Regions:
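Active-site residues of response regulator receiver
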Residues: 59, 84
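C-terminal output helix
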Residues: 90, 108-117
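Alpha4 helix (beta4-alpha4-beta5 surface) of REC/receiver domains from two-component response regulators
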Residues: 69, 87-102
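Short amphipathic alpha-helix used as the core "switch/output" element in two-component signaling
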Residues: 46, 65-78
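C-terminal output/effector regions of signal-responsive regulators
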Residues: 122-126, 132-174
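Non-catalytic signal-transmission and effector/linker regions of two-component phosphorelay proteins
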Residues: 1-9
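Acidic catalytic/metal-coordinating carboxylates
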Residues: 40-43, 54, 61-69
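Two-component/phosphorelay signaling modules centered on CheY-like receiver
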Residues: 5, 16-36
Length: 174
């Protein structure tokens, strides 16, 4: 389990009650905190919004809303790990396209889940960090474009050199 002092919070969505209860017990015994359980994708989406888990573990085949369709919405809240008996290429591709971070095929053991859980959460955090960095760089680039346009206007209007117009902008901004 993660070395963080806080337990990783997990949402479990599985329509088969016995499998869901076994999974919850396995996760709890491994040191994870199961904050919500759902028997279908629609409830999983509601629970994800309500509890904001660190990870959602979803079965693919569930009533009402299937796991992959639910994952498409949950992915904006937390990373998703698919846990399913189905390994058909079409399902794996749908899960990949939905943004799922891991895909574990049943039967499974906790030894199969822990690495998938830890890697999914780690990759999700890395992606969020990169998204923040990209947004920051984009903002800085846009600011730079505005400054360059302002320099051009000053150079023309006040007959200044580029360094002089930049200095004028710096002094005026302070």
């Amino acid at each position: 389990m993660s070395t963080n002092s806080q337990k990783i919070k997990i949402l479990v969505a599985e329509d088969e009650t016995i499998i869901r209860l076994d999974l919850v017990e396995m996760l709890t015994d491994a040191g994870y905190e199961v904050v919500a359980q759902a028997e279908n994708g629609a409830i999983a989406i509601e629970m994800a919004k309500k509890y904001q888990p660190d990870l959602a573990i979803l079965d693919v085949k569930m009533p009402e809303v299937d796991g992959i369709t639910a994952a498409e919405q949950i992915i904006s809240i937390s990373p998703v790990l698919m846990l399913t008996a189905f390994s058909q290429r079409e399902l794996v591709e749908r899960a990949r396209d939905a943004g799922v971070m891991a895909y574990v095929v049943k039967p499974f053991s906790i030894g199969d889940l822990v690495p998938a859980i830890e890697i999914a959460i780690s990759r999700h955090r890395q992606m969020k960090t990169l998204e923040t960095e990209v947004a920051d760089l984009y903002e800085r680039l846009e600011t730079r474009k505005i400054i360059d346009r302002a320099k051009g206007i000053l150079m023309k209007a006040m007959n200044l050199s580029e360094p002089e117009s930049f200095n004028w902008i710096q002094k005026t901004a302070m």
